[in-house]
């Protein structure tokens, strides 16, 4: 399914498995950053703008960039992370921002998640983000802490799907080691 707009419509969100949306939702993109440590995989998370929660590097789309390029930009800006990103998203999830007692209320977003293997960390534009590596289980806990149960389930599914893709590609690359460092992830 291709999306050409920065908004997803209710039918498309319901096709993702959620009946919560009855209107068009704004779109964000996330870089699900990972690295390999021998047989182990770690995920890179950043602090939210408020600093007390963890998230994937994510942000708005940009008409001048593809969605994967926008996710790659977020990884660089928020985490100083550079590497190989998949050209297509591997998962969609819902994200709520804000609190109901504030004047702005709660805003829901549909987030396209792009898998990105990190090869280098260097200076970042947003120093308060504190990029940190976590095991898959610790990443799930950090993403869930202080959040609604539905968001915790959404991000747990992102980690699980990412691990499936990483392990699939690891098995494939194991058969063709000469291609290991000259690829972008795709399936």
Indicate residue ranges for each PLM-predicted region.
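Nudix hydrolase/Nudix homology domain
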Residues: 52-53, 123-187
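Acidic, metal-coordinating catalytic segment for phosphate/diphosphate chemistry
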Residues: 2-38
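Active-site segment of metal-dependent pyrophosphate-handling enzymes
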Residues: 76, 80-122
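Conserved hydrophobic/aromatic beta-strand scaffold that supports enzyme active sites
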Residues: 32, 45, 113-115, 133
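Short, solvent-exposed loop/turn segments that connect beta-strands within catalytic domains
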Residues: 36-42, 104-106
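Conserved Nudix-box catalytic region and its N-terminal flanking loop in Nudix hydrolases
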Residues: 39-82
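Short loop segments at secondary-structure junctions
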Residues: 35-38, 117-122, 136-138
